[in-house]
Structures are given as structure tokens and as C-alpha cells.
Amino acid sequence: MYHSRMPTASSLHVVLVHPEIHWNTGNAGRTCLAAGATLHLIEPLGFSLGAREVQRAGLDYWEQVDLRVWQHWEAFEEVLPSLGAPWFFSTKGRQAYWDAPMGSASGAVLVFGRETAGLPPQLHERYAERFVTMPMHSAHIRSLNLSTTVGIAVYEVLRQRRALAL
């Protein structure tokens, strides 16, 4: 890790692996701030973090986002066990996200792939049992928008925690 804005005790982490679209990252950051989550970005990114569009998508909240930037997945993976249980979101997941026990008090790490290709194959192999999906009614839809999926997943964790009274 080489970039961090502020320390956090967050037990909810959102990880975007190689995000390509600045608007999605800005929106995900805004959701993280609203939910008290840390946003982790795994390089390479498809944009500059200094881009006006990223900041506009996050509105005037962007500077308050607890942001961590990692040069590659392996660097992030070293700290992953200390953050909580990872859940990988993919159209290839076998379990619906609402059936996954993501609300653990020990921490939840929600991992999302890039907009055009999803998560790298090596993550599918290594973490196959941790993959979840967002069921979709229409076969005409390949996937949901990344920032929409982040919002659904983050608030599902919060809903589960409330149900568990954590």
C-alpha cells in the first residue's frame, strides 16, 4: 500500500480490482463514506485519481473517503486476513449475495472486478467458495453497473449486521 488518507477502524471494506471508469469509483467512494467503509483500489486503474470526474462523482465528499491504493493484488492480499472475510462479487458466483453471511462482526471485505472483465481468473480459482452473485431476472443483462452493485452489497452487510444486532 502506498496511499492512505486517514486511519480507520472500519470492519467493512470495499475493494475495486482494476476499476476502469472514474464515475463508478467516485460513486463507490461516496457509498463507502456514507456507510463508514474503507475503499481499497487495486492498480492499475483506468483513470487518474486526480481526475476531475472522480471527484465530481464523489461530489465534495471525495476528500473524506477512507481510501487505500494498492499497487497490485498480492500486496493487498497480504493484509486481507486481518480485514475480515472476503466475498467476491461475480456473475459466475454460485450463491446469491443475500444467502452469504456477510454481516460478521469480525469484518467483511467486498471485492469487485473491473467493469469490462470482472475479477481475474486466479481469484476465481483461489477463492471459488467465496464467490457470490446478484441474481438477475432478465437473460438480456450481462451484469449490473459496478457502483450499483457496490451499493447493494454494502447495504446488505449493514442489513445483516442490524439483524444480528452487531
Each predicted region: which residue ranges?
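Post-transcriptional modification and biogenesis factors for structured RNAs
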Residues: 1-166
